[in-house]
Amino acid sequence: MPEGPEIRRAADNLEAAIKGKPLTDVWFAFAQLKPYESQLTGQLVTRIETRGKALLTHFSNGLTLYSHNQLYGVWRVIDTGEIPQTTRILRVRLQTADKTILLYSASDIEMLTAEQLTTHPFLQRVGPDVLDARLTPEEVKARLLSPRFRNRQFSGLLLDQAFLAGLGNYLRVEILWQVGLTGQHKAKDLNEAQLNALSHALLDIPRLSYTTRGQADENKHHGALFRFKVFHRDGEACERCGGIIEKTTLSSRPFYWCPHCQK
């Protein structure tokens, strides 16, 4: 499943295609959304927000389309009039004069009013988004030490969207390697230096992944661009200590780590 950085990049692509342009045609597959087709035609997409792995498409009339891709959903951008060759099932089409965005295969799709946004079960449940620039390491540290989370092992906590939205398995693996900890630790057992390092890594690594993953490191500046240090690198040497990276299972997900320098 895509994690927060991938979801945010997808939202950026969708925004670049249709934000601020009048919608010339709107189509929904689900019967309960059909009444909104005429209400949205002629309106503008004002912004596309991410809340962890959910997308919120905000319209100029105050409505918001909530969608969660789950395992199989995918958004695509096409030129208006193009007919994509795909076996996927179309769920949403938002069309402008020159670009159209399409949502395939997703089933978790709703239209929300401004009031419903504040009471939606998933949105109420998720924690602050790691890609929200307003979120600070100090706030993350306070969250780590809160009664709700301080006794949770990191193996499960870093996959829990109620703790921080947008984290997932590869981020869990890379964050714990960065701070030299195993997944069995709990926040209540860390010293001040470890807490500070983890609080920063929980924001720095997702944000680095969002801004640079997939780019070529032309200047060869070590650490300037995101790349996997341990994820999917079992059997290779750890670049920090030379130990051999191992693969195991934690919280029912593949976990990669260096037993030599992660304690």
UniProtKB/Swiss-Prot annotation:
A zinc finger (FPG-type) spans 229-263. Its cofactor is Zn(2+). Disulfide bonds: none annotated. The active site is at P2 (schiff-base intermediate with dna), E3 (proton donor), K53 (proton donor), R253 (proton donor). DNA binds at Q70, R125, N169. Binds 1 zinc ion per subunit. The keyword Nucleus does not apply. Keywords: DNA damage, DNA repair, DNA-binding, Glycosidase, Hydrolase, Lyase, Metal-binding, Multifunctional enzyme, Zinc, Zinc-finger. It holds the Pfam family Fapy_DNA_glyco. It catalyses: 2'-deoxyribonucleotide-(2'-deoxyribose 5'-phosphate)-2'-deoxyribonucleotide-DNA = a 3'-end 2'-deoxyribonucleotide-(2,3-dehydro-2,3-deoxyribose 5'-phosphate)-DNA + a 5'-end 5'-phospho-2'-deoxyribonucleoside-DNA + H(+). It comes from the Bacteria. One of its GO terms (biological process) is base-excision repair. Its EC number is 3.2.2.-, 4.2.99.18. GO terms for molecular function: class I DNA-(apurinic or apyrimidinic site) endonuclease activity; damaged DNA binding; oxidized pyrimidine nucleobase lesion DNA N-glycosylase activity; zinc ion binding. Involved in base excision repair of DNA damaged by oxidation or by mutagenic agents. Acts as a DNA glycosylase that recognizes and removes damaged bases. Has a preference for oxidized pyrimidines, such as thymine glycol, 5,6-dihydrouracil and 5,6-dihydrothymine. Has AP (apurinic/apyrimidinic) lyase activity and introduces nicks in the DNA strand. Cleaves the DNA backbone by beta-delta elimination to generate a single-strand break at the site of the removed base with both 3'- and 5'-phosphates. Belongs to the FPG family. PANTHER family: ENDONUCLEASE 8. This is Endonuclease 8. It comes from Salmonella heidelberg (strain SL476). The gene is nei.
